Amino acid sequence: MANTIPFKLITPTQVVFEGDAELVIAVTTEGEEGILPSHAPFLAALKPGVLRANVRKDGNVERLELATREGFMQALPDRVTVLVDEALRFDDVDVAKAREEAASSDRVTADFGAAKLRLTGH
């Protein structure tokens, strides 16, 4: 059994990662699924969640963690391909901006609720 498997993570706009992985773990509609080299053929729908992979970089193993949206994962004995609507590395998350956007979303939701109450009375 090989120690790694070629792994590609793709969104509609870019190839987010392409390289060798020792392990790929994704959240499927049936639960978490881990893929190792020489895995039996497998196709799964993915739910939003955290995709984790132990990837090889410069001879070392690094943990790759990304927040992903819906998509699909195909595992073959010689490769793993993940197609998702969006993938974001945790290191790329701007926490202050995310909090600001969440607060803005809460305000919009509250405004919508108030407008609905005025129009319908409940």
Each PLM stretch: what is its role?
Residues 6-99:
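Compact, glycine-rich, soluble single-domain proteins
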Residues 85-122:
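Acidic/glycine-rich phosphate/pyrophosphate-binding loops and surrounding catalytic core
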